[in-house]
Amino acid sequence: MNELLTLTAAELGERIAARQISSEEVTQAHLDRISEVDGDIHAFLLVDHAGALDAARRIDARIADGEHLGPLAGVPLAVKDLFCTKGIATTASSQMLEGWIPPYDSTIVTRCKDAGMVILGKTNLDEFAMGSSTETSAFGPTHNPWDLERVPGGSGGGSAASLASFQAPLALGTDTGGSIRQPGAVTGTVGIKPTYGSTSRYGVIAMASSLDTPGPCARTVLDAALLHQAIAGHDAMDQTTINQPTPAVVEAARQTDVSGVRIGVVTELSGQVYDPQVEARFHEAVEMLIEAGAEVVEVSCPNFDLALPAYYLIQPAEVSSNLARYDAMRYGLRVNDDGEHSAEQVMRATRGAGLGAEAKRRIILGTYALSAGYYDAYYGSAQKVRTLIQRDFEKAWQMCDVLVSPATPTTAFRLGERTADPMAMYRSDLCTVPANMAGSPAGSFPIGLSETDGMPVGMQVMAPIMADDRIYRVGAALERLLHEKWGAPLLAKAPEVRGER
């Protein structure tokens, strides 16, 4: 494998700035890697070869002219195909957006371009980000680089798989109920869900607007922090963004000392549905943090048990509202538009043909939850539970600085294993949903491999609102401790993907 592929984003940025290497050669190396292995992985839906190389050359020219750019200038970036990209097709992995090319960039894509990052292309996801395995994509599933017969998590499996297979050093994701953290956990990469409202949703195709949170995906904690710093901040185009300074995430990622940090282990996020190997790796990681000087206590958050059922009422309710905009009248797919069918018939036929089974399931569930006679019993009750979960977090912060749990109940399951059982699929989000319900920041960090199936295991770290830096501090400590134990990053243990399929 080309050495440029294994360098961290921080290392690439430093060498590009020092003109030891060029952005063009780094970008070309990643494009070559995509051509070599993505037939096996299917992380990308679209690769912008010409656009990426052109952007890289422009960065090289600016550096040659003496401009001092940011720490990620010239570094390639994969973008989840939920972010609008001007002049580049954006599909949300759905047939409904067939042929649609956005006339503008999302705020976060704009910020990445302003920071000098080079967009390689758009990555695969579950349709409209609805799923936990990247199997509901209209364009086929993504495969886990650790085992091509297993899922890479979801919804953002494409972004995580692109990192784990060394096709990109950085990626953008979105997290509504775990769609950054869960893929990170099962692919051995780092995934961060920032505080809700600290990253702009403008230009991100909406799924559940009170939960959707864009965030960084990377192979190292520092790389995630550098990307986080580049994309976060208030945006006048998104009135839900928080007008406060971004926490010092990069400084925290460089600090690997956890002496005196109070860590709470959530008692409710364990039990029979958890793989014993996942729990074993989790408790080993907790012991390492204790040995490093952290203070660990058990914390009860009783309403976390209600988070998953409440989430799967609130999220579909918002889906049923957001997806109503796809009416075949203005853009995207249009079926039976032959002059002989009414607008209502065209709309019905288009939605029937363009939306997948999971999208339809959640629209129906959400519409039912919002319907007259059921609103208070379902949606209203779920919102009350959401408040109780927020109170659980508030009580927890009186006892500890961060909360930790396994990032997922199991390791990556086999492709097709849960597609016929929606409830089993939904349980993949058991650990991650509470943070979304509260708007709290959370991250997933690799902590080892299952001795049963050899697949990665992740630890989740949660922090108070706008205390994202605490996540990076604990994550950086974990990374250092485990690198010392293993002698190399976890991904060094991953099997080589050779592009033979």
UniProtKB/Swiss-Prot annotation:
Which terms does the UniProt entry file under GO BP?
translation
Highest taxon of source: Bacteria
PROSITE patterns, per database record: AMIDASES (PS00571)
Q: Which UniProt keywords apply?
A: ATP-binding, Ligase, Nucleotide-binding, Protein biosynthesis
Recorded catalytic reaction(s): these are: L-glutamyl-tRNA(Gln) + L-glutamine + ATP + H2O = L-glutaminyl-tRNA(Gln) + L-glutamate + ADP + phosphate + H(+)
Keyword Protein biosynthesis present in the record's keywords: the answer is yes
**EC annotation from Swiss-Prot or TrEMBL:** 6.3.5.7
Active site at 80 (charge relay system), 155 (charge relay system), 179 (acyl-ester intermediate)
Cleaved signal peptide residues: none
Single GO molecular-function term?
A: ATP binding
Give the first-level EC class, as a single word: ligase
> What GO cellular component is one of the record's annotations?
glutamyl-tRNA(Gln) amidotransferase complex
In terms of Pfam families, this protein maps to: Amidase (PF01425)
What's this protein's family per the entry? Answer: Belongs to the amidase family. GatA subfamily.
Write out the function statement from the record: Allows the formation of correctly charged Gln-tRNA(Gln) through the transamidation of misacylated Glu-tRNA(Gln) in organisms which lack glutaminyl-tRNA synthetase. The reaction takes place in the presence of glutamine and ATP through an activated gamma-phospho-Glu-tRNA(Gln).
Assembly and partners are described as: Heterotrimer of A, B and C subunits.
PANTHER family the record matches: GLUTAMYL-TRNA(GLN) AMIDOTRANSFERASE SUBUNIT A, TRANSAMIDASE
Q: What is this protein called?
A: Glutamyl-tRNA(Gln) amidotransferase subunit A
Q: What organism does the UniProt record list as the source?
A: Cutibacterium acnes (strain DSM 16379 / KPA171202)
Q: Which gene encodes it?
A: gatA
